[in-house]
Amino acid sequence: MCGIVGYIGYDNAKELLLKGLEKLEYRGYDSAGIAVVNDDNTTVFKEKGRIAELRKVADSSDFDGPVGIGHTRWATHGVPNHENSHPHQSSNGRFTLVHNGVIENYEELKGEYLQGVSFISETDTEVIVQLVEYFSNQGLSTEEAFTKVVSLLHGSYALGLLDAEDKDTIYVAKNKSPLLLGVGEGFNVIASDALAMLQVTSEYKEIHDHEIVIVKKDEVIIKDADGNVVERDSYIAEIDASDAEKGVYAHYMLKEIHEQPAVMRRIIQEYQDAEGNLKIDQDIINDVKEADRIYVIAAGTSYHAGLVGKEFLEKWAGVPTEVHVASEFVYNMPLLSEKPLFVYISQSGETADSRAVLVETNKLGHKSLTITNVAGSTLSREADHTLLLHAGPEIAVASTKAYTAQIAVLSILSQIVAKEHGREADIDLLRELAKVTTAIEAIVDDAPIMEQIATDFLETTRNAFFIGRTIDYNVSLEGALKLKEISYIQAEGFAGGELKHGTIALIEEGTPVVGLATQEKVNLSIRGNVKEVVARGAHPCIISMEGLEKEGDTYVIPHVHELLTPLVSVVTLQLISYYAALHRDLDVDKPRNLAKSVTVE
């Protein structure tokens, strides 16, 4: 949620900042702004709405300079409007600030230090910048004032501060909110993620929580909470900028659906040794082997992937596994086993709720593993181990290729641990994943069929239901989430056997019901459930698998191993959801009220 960019160097900053913000659009936002500094002045441009509107305003002015900060805002304190947009300035105009996160004690700070100060916005951010001015007026240097203010803040924040009387510096701090430092020759940048500033550098340094960073064009000084200078190596962000472009596709979501076969091949390659055997780090294997129970912590689509992963971990590896919603777990932790292993699944590696759980389990000394798409992300840094998805940048808000990548990686982990436990495999996983890849390609080629299904079943409906049994039920949850995320159709996923326990009361004439029928032992049962809703006027869509199909099924996916069917059947639901939104003329990649990375609790 939200995004920050900053530049200090020799080039004019305005265009670099605007392009950087455009690369952060996928994170979700409702307003955007930049502040640019030159020898004469600090000028702020900000607008409610899309960055295209901000660009019009900024481009209408000739003002530019070699230093600046930018921000995309997702409203938390105060409605989306011009006044609440970032950057914010102090009363005397000397200090300018951008901020991601939520300050929990801003009202207390406002009451204690800022009595009589006139505020323009409703935001917690303006309190921060006014506090910097307050302590500056008490005689503190800008660095001292900034450090003092940061020490008072409770909550999450990533901060970038400009001082009109010190035009050669950006002051930076973070806690529980992502922010990176980009390194260049004669310039430096800050960004919420590396993608934003790949236009100028691929070399980055991490910023850790509670650190103060003094950024100048020719040097960077990192200080810990005690004021000690910290030396830190840089790393190269292994991202191809072209991976973040739509290319020939109309939308990022469609591109990312089509990329799934390539992602599967990349995962097979990355997790295979020279002899053609599955491989992961031995330390990870040892910790999973020693665990008497695995607790999967995730949110949204990653949670649904975790539900599928539970099937692998229990059926193949023989490890009891629980899957928990991160935002609930952190406040309602169950009784834990003696030797738990926590597995955190997050596409971005920045999910605030999951990180909150990780902080608590780290305090308890429990082992942890992060499954993420982003090397160097907060979860990957703070967990004991990391397994990467190798899916490439996922820009569309609605996750597609990350979901299938998460399931594939979980299947590999489970099979390796099964072997370590001496459990006989009933599957040649690499061969089966290759079959899955071919099956996904076939479904992607059938995209026109999915478009017709979407048109027939979902274009004008008010609600829709997805039903399945066993592992198909887990996929039905993800199918419903995809549809509601981007088409704004009220959609719910249910276990087929639960229909008679309340849900069937919602069925009326023409209600679309998508039934997944890819599991042999429950094939007749789920078809019976479909007949029940048809008898009450529902409009059915049955997605089955070769070998289990019946006459009249809407679509039949190629045959794959039953436990791997989620990797294939979900692609049909992704495409159906995409075309349902497309035919409703909606913003597929940036649905309303949603953010790609949920970085506040």
Curated annotation (Swiss-Prot):
E.C. numbers? 2.6.1.16
Q: Name one GO molecular function term.
A: carbohydrate derivative binding
Q: Known InterPro entries for this protein? A: GATase_2_dom, GFAT, GFAT_N, GlmS/AgaS_SIS, GlmS/FrlB_SIS, Ntn_hydrolases_N, SIS_dom, SIS_dom_sf
| Gene Ontology biological process terms from the UniProt entry | carbohydrate metabolic process; fructose 6-phosphate metabolic process; protein N-linked glycosylation; UDP-N-acetylglucosamine metabolic process
Q: Does the keyword Kinase apply?
A: no
Query: What does this protein's UniProt record list under function?
Result: Catalyzes the first step in hexosamine metabolism, converting fructose-6P into glucosamine-6P using glutamine as a nitrogen source.
Query: What protein name is recorded for this chain?
Result: Glutamine--fructose-6-phosphate aminotransferase [isomerizing]
- Organism of origin is Staphylococcus aureus (strain MRSA252)
